[in-house]
Amino acid sequence: MGILHPSYAAVVLLLGALACALVVMVISNQERLTLSTRRIRTTATKFLVTQEGYDYNILNPTPVEYVRSAKNGYAMYSVNMWKDPKVLATMEHDEDVWSICAHEDLPNLDVYFKADKKDEGILDQAITIFSLDCRSIDYESYGVTGFIVAMDKFGNVVNALPHGKGAPGGLTLGRSEGISMYNTTTAILAAVHGGFLWDYVTGELEALPFVADTHSLVYRWDDNKYYGMYSDAESRKTHSPQGMGAFDGNTGANKMDDPAYPGWGYLDDSHLNYLTVDGPFAYGSSRGESTLYKIDMRTNQKVWALGGRDSNFTIYGINGQPYDTKLHKYAPERYPWNHQHKFQHLGMGFYSLFDNNVGDGHEQVPKPWGTSSRNVILYVDEASRQAWEVFSHPTGDNAMSYGGTDLLPSGNVLTTSYVDWVHPADPDHQYHVNIWEVSTATNEVEWRAGFKGFNPVAPENLRDPYPHYFFDPLNPDGHVPTLWNIYTADRAYSTVFALHLCSARGGAAVRFSPFNTVRTQNDAPGVAYLLDPQGQVAAQKPFMYQKAWLDRPEEIEVPPGLARFQLGLNNQWDNPWAQDVDMHTLQACA
């Protein structure tokens, strides 16, 4: 895993008055910087500067050796998204995009595959859905462009949806952050101007009958309710949600708009940034308190707190050491995680989070693994009030904002990673933002999508490092992300499927691990069946798909005398899958 980036705040302050590439931009009401005079006045040839022979200056933040890119055993594909007609259509109304965010002749996306993981059948048919937006340092036109992208694992754009003008039906989304899945082909978008449903296959866009905060929005089929944070005036002003609750799936009714509404609502001013639900319980991720709260939606009482000063658990690190949770003052270096994003309930006792590992002033916190942000999966025993880190992966980036850690059917985690500094001449650290797949078994990166951009002050300079944010003293968070960013991402598969087939109980049954097309808030109904050689149903069994793609095996009885058949699966949206099985050659279960 290695030792990772140090904190660079002191370096930034020293360089503030120098006319060099390391510029931290200070914005005030009296002095607004604009890029209108900093147009790219160069040809593609001038952009293609050499990356050889570059030495880091002593004042430049230097990334330590932590190889995550195309070395031995990796294959890389470069993609020019700006040549894709679907992407171009989302940008035609954004006149500043070519001067600030993109160059039409330069590829902006590199996709890496671990060579032995490039042909994995159904796992390679995954679609990644995310919001990619570019932000300038001009506060008067901060959001330059942005779009929702559905992309396959080879970097091909399946579909794209603009944040602004050009969206279907004349709708305007505004910048989107939280993305989750409604069904196999439809994403839920938590955007500035409301909640939306987007079918990435048909391109259809539907506005939901309410406005929620942009951090998080999920849907539960069991009760036809959306769950998210409220978008009241104070929340929008501070970009810090003041509460969370349920929104009626038909009317959008909620307790913030109507206190008499019988649905669930909960007020909290600790900067909530993610919400998951399971049964009668809600799990609220409090960035401000570095905590996950479990709340009984029937009584609105907190059941427990996991992490932070008020933690009810003994928490053990990845090496078995207990963290000191009996803290009487803010001590980020002693917390298990700091200012996390997407702290979520996975089921079966498991939880995951993206540990941004930042303290006061967005400074990275020194920890045993360095100062890097990291992916974390926990196993929690509620009865004994103990929790264990079972997976910890430092990303190699100091991600002061954003991020997630989602389990995948492959056993990998899907994560996004914001960077604080960009190093254009370093193949590993040249990207503004990354989407990763990391193996929970080996801690190795098995897939990566890295998105490139430009220095906002000197876009023709492709050599010198530059900050991926500017400092705004009027902003509560201070450090404001700039240029290309991704808040989080989600995954979808076109069909359900099973992995790890084996012969159980001496050949009397087939054991398999079923996976739904998307992640859901509660376990979702499914059916398994066996088809004989004539295509007739020989056996059938209902079951529930594990909601977060945890590996939970099922078994189905094999009728006596049936040796060759198809194992089939289906879900509530009719996305069937089948595979031939021969009991004579099927490996016995361990």
Regions found by a protein language model. Name each.
Residues N29, S36-A590:
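Histidine-/acidic-rich catalytic cores in large beta-rich domains
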Residues M1-L4, A590:
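A positional/structural detector of protein chain ends, strongest at the extreme C-terminus
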Residues I3-R32:
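N-terminal signal-anchor transmembrane helix specifying type II single-pass membrane topology
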